[in-house]
Amino acid sequence: LQIMVAMHTINQNSKIEDLNQINEKLKTCVPSLKNEEQLKLIEASTAMYQRFLKQDYTDKTARAFEAFGYAVLDQKQRDPKKVIQSQKKLFDQLSPRDQYLLQHEGQAYIELLYQGEGMFTYRRQPNYLVDVFSKALPADQKEFLSRMAKDNQDIFYNDGALAVSWKELTERALFWEKFIQKYPKSYFINDAKLLFNEYRYFIFFGLDNTPVSNEYAPNTWFDPDALQQIRFLSTQSQSSLAKPAQQFLKFIATPVDERNTQFKTDLIDENGQKKSTYQIVHEQLEQLLKFDSPWNTEVYRDCHIDAVCIDTN
């Protein structure tokens, strides 16, 4: 494919016009291709944007980019263009490539994304794959990309905390469960399963800074919204989440002493330190629910930045 050759020439010295040209060509040629070729082009387009947005920072330019990010955060609309105008001196300290990307932010689906914890990154806007490819794809692929683009407009977590509501988290888990049942042979099936497992885990365990509970025990604190969703799931008999929700509710009603005899957990960690209550309870719950933590993985596949999942090392 001629277009594939053109895509491979895009790198961190390419211009916005080069991307626009390729994207226009893709829109016209994708509908006439076999699905196998369409999927190869989706993959190639993701790699193309990664090369285009790749940065080689020195200490100095990295610090300047960080400072620029904070200036964007301080600005009411969080509009990089306004910061470029108002903080000329700061802008001049950026690397030439940063200056170029920021001046063209919003074009060719280039977006400056706030990732939380004071960190910014460039990304391809998740709507890209929907706009350029979606219309020509089979139903399962179309549905996958549309849902991902919708969910990933904003960040999913920020500073060890969920950035979405418990209700939204539950709704996402139920969506992917249905997707897996509806399209068991989908090209994206493994990523759909990954998303389902990830959301399922967070429903019951939360994140460090948005826990479901600290002690998961009778008469202790629970996040009321999280608990409400788990109670709701315990009644959804058509979902595989009903059983873990019922087990969870039984677990949190069981006195701690009784639980400690019921579950075999080491109270001392491998360094000979006494484990925290939080740690012990998490291990007991993992034993009970048999869920794997999304963090226990060699390569983390990020499903929250684009309309497809991307391996990060």
Segments from the language model and where they lie:
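N-terminal Sec/ER secretory leader and immediately downstream segment
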Residues: 1-122
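Short solvent-exposed coil/turn linkers within tandem alpha-helical repeat scaffolds
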Residues: 32-36, 55-58, 131-139, 179-191, ...
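Extended amphipathic alpha-helical interaction segments
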Residues: 96-216
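Hydrophilic extracytoplasmic domains
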Residues: 217-313
